[in-house]
Amino acid sequence: MMPVRTYHHHHHHNNSNNHRLRRIIPRVLLAVFAIYAVSFAAYLLRHQSPHPHPHPAADPERDAVDAAGGGGGGGAVDRVRVEAPSSQKPWPRLPSFLPWTSASVRPPPKHSCEGYFGNGFSRLVDVLPARGGGGGGWFRCHHSETLRSSICEGGRVRLDPGLIAMSRGGEPLDQVMGRAEEEELPKYEPGALQVEAAAKRTGPLVEAGFLDAYVPTGGIGMHTMRSLLDSGRVVPPGELHCSQWVEEPTLLVTRFEYANLFHTITDWYSAYVSSRVTDLPNRPNVVFVDGHCKAQLEQTWEALFSNVTYVKNFSGPVCFRHAILSPLGYETALFKGLSESFSCEGASAESLREKPDHQKTARLSEFGEMILASFDLLRDDILSSKTSNGLNVLFVRREDYLAHPRHSGKVESRLSNEKEVYDAIEGWAKGQKCKINVINGLFAHMNMKEQLRAIQEASVVIGAHGAGLTHLVSATPDTKVLEIISSMYRRPHFALISHWKSLEYHAINLPGSYARVTDVINELSNILKGFGC
């Protein structure tokens, strides 16, 4: 009987072992899986980045500094942190967008159309190279031989408002009437700009020879970007004393003629190009390094970019993880085209994708779309309904309004009988077979979204030579232009913009500033025939 009992006992023992194993194995597997999951999560957190930083060497240590800017990088806050997703606005999808930087895109030839409007900033000059092992700042410039200007950028860059002599900026207009323009433009003391070196290097950031080669004055009386670079100093590691850190990429911009739409659009274009050439993943912040008072156009800066402030609003020295110095508006193709002759015409991005041509450009259309998208106007429903209710003839008016502290509130008349011409067109339109809506473009009394919508919906834009016509950068490709030009203002601004946008352009050149109503109506009538009217 014993063998039988032994057999039964052994069988029972095996059963209990199997039972225990069946309980233990899942637990072991679960524990192994949990350890693996935790270590994988830790790995992800350690390597997480919401978007590729364009310059990984800019600041590898990533000091634990609040994204809003608090802390001077000392004491308890110096701990490694997980980078938060960007708070900056993403780039909108633009139908006319063409790549600015990519291995497959070769730099455009010097003095070509794309060299003027696109990424002709093809010469990279390393002023302060980033250290391979990390640590320290960096500084470099992208130079355009075509425009004879540079877009400069750096990491661990300090700007000290206390070393910039100018007005505070951003004040209400009525508080600063009569203030001289010189007071509003920056004068820098040495060290106003500082960049932290990776090694114990000190001294000027750049020499005079560098400035002459890469940031020449080019006939600009007060070249503030050159002056800012001239004030630049390199400081050793740990010597960059900051009251505040700005984590996000930031454009440093100095505006001239900031209340004038034409000059402001040159500033917007320069800021847009600077953002694309430096390959920013999102729309940057903007710091105005000027002391101009509040102006209506500031709202459009805020719509185009992520955040806008004045440098004098910072309470002390402010440091940037990534700062970009945007060239002056005077250095853009929009301005240089007034005095330099170059072959360039507008084309659709679609045609340039199929057949690249450096003597054609879609960049102004891309930029116009950027402005529209910033006001949520780049919508198919707006474009598809453009002519559903008749043809819009937009008459861009010049009217009196107080623009800046040195302004009388009166605008020079470029068309002495503007009201007579407007009334005559309105009367004539009512008698036509096809439906023509004459739109009274009192732009100085319309907000930017209303102005852009009026331009977008216009089949014909008509007006005396004046800054309001610069909105043509946002016109749709089928828009036709009629400019009435007095003998005192025979300048090519809007003929050129129309050409660079490939818009059909017509002009009436007046012997003085008085237009014969019949001449204007005859010209307008001929233009409308092109719409089958």
Swiss-Prot record:
GO MF annotations in UniProt: glycoprotein 2-beta-D-xylosyltransferase activity; UDP-xylosyltransferase activity
Q: Where in the cell is it found?
A: Golgi apparatus membrane
Q: What is the protein name for this chain?
A: Beta-1,2-xylosyltransferase RCN11
Q: Which UniProt keywords apply?
A: Glycoprotein, Glycosyltransferase, Golgi apparatus, Membrane, Signal-anchor, Stress response, Transferase, Transmembrane, Transmembrane helix
GO BP term, example: post-translational protein targeting to membrane, translocation
Q: Which residues lie on this side of the membrane: Cytoplasmic?
A: 1-23
The tissues in which it is expressed are: Expressed at the base of the crown roots and in the basal region of the shoot, which contains the shoot and axillary meristems.
According to its UniProt entry, the function of this protein is described as: Glycosyltransferase involved in the xylosylation of N-glycans. Possesses beta-1,2-xylosyltransferase activity, transferring xylose from UDP-xylose to the core beta-linked mannose of N-glycans. Beta-1,2-linked xylose residues on N-glycans are critical for seed germination and plant development and growth under conditions of abiotic stress.
Identify the taxonomic lineage of the organism of origin: Eukaryota, Viridiplantae, Streptophyta, Embryophyta, Tracheophyta
> What protein family does this chain belong to?
Belongs to the glycosyltransferase 61 family.
Q: Does the keyword Transmembrane apply?
A: yes
Top EC class of this enzyme:
transferase
Sites carrying a glycan are N307, N313
Give the E.C. number(s): 2.4.2.-
Gene that this polypeptide is encoded by:
RCN11
Quote the pathway field: Glycan metabolism
| Originating organism | Oryza sativa subsp. japonica
Gene deletion effect: Reduced number of tillers and reduced biomass.
Skewed-composition ranges (Basic and acidic residues) = 56-65
